[in-house]
Amino acid sequence: THSVPGSEKEGEYKEETAVEILNSMVPLWRKNKNEISTEEYNEFYKSRFTDYHDPLDVIHFKSEGTATFDSIIYIPSAAPFDFYSKEYEKGLALYTNGVMIMEKCADLVPDYFSFVKGIVDSADLNLNISRETLQQDHQVRIIAKAIDRKIKSELKKMLTNDREKYEKFFDVFGVQIKWGVYSNYGAEKDGLKDLMMFKSVKNNKYVTLKEYVENMPEGQEKIYYACGEAPEKIALLPQTEAVTAKGFDVLCFTDDVDEFAVQMLMEYD
């Protein structure tokens, strides 16, 4: 409420009530992303999720339809210090109408995206929903599927449009993607296989399976790979040299999961 000069008599004042929403009071995830600077995104991330590093990428999107929600999802630039420990908890902060229900809702992200941080705010959820009920909640499952699709879509865009950034991402979290291809008997392999990369013997640079197949010379009918500690050592193996002598490239499998992930595909078109 503020006073303005009255028009009836000089010196008279009348009361007017002005309803204003201060932009600074609107949660970041509810703002239009065109109004938010990179610095604001980064500062919010570092403050909210106690990270000293700027995030590698930000996925800010709204969904309307079967599930209506606002969300900001961050891909860290480095693995959390406890990421590979039993103490690490995956999950996104879950809100309903700006009120937090849970600090880390594990049901919102699959294990292969366990590294992401973020916030989801939906008006479709009951404020009193319990942790046990969440697992069976239809809306939560719909939201989780939408988030999964969005992260996959944004990673594919990054791979296509910003190769350098994607390779940085894959250096840090590529093993998670490969485990995602292999786990649950390959249930998610079709959505993740084109996000996998491996170093090749030919130039010691990352290639996707699609790129490898597209560059196969005439006469090559198989994908060749070799396991070892590092591409430099794999290149010196007699078996590798026998294949490269034919003009065929060899993929370097340096993580334990690599062979399992590719075998889960059975074949690659």
What are these regions (language model features)?
Residues T1-D269:
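Conserved GHKL (Bergerat-fold) ATPase module
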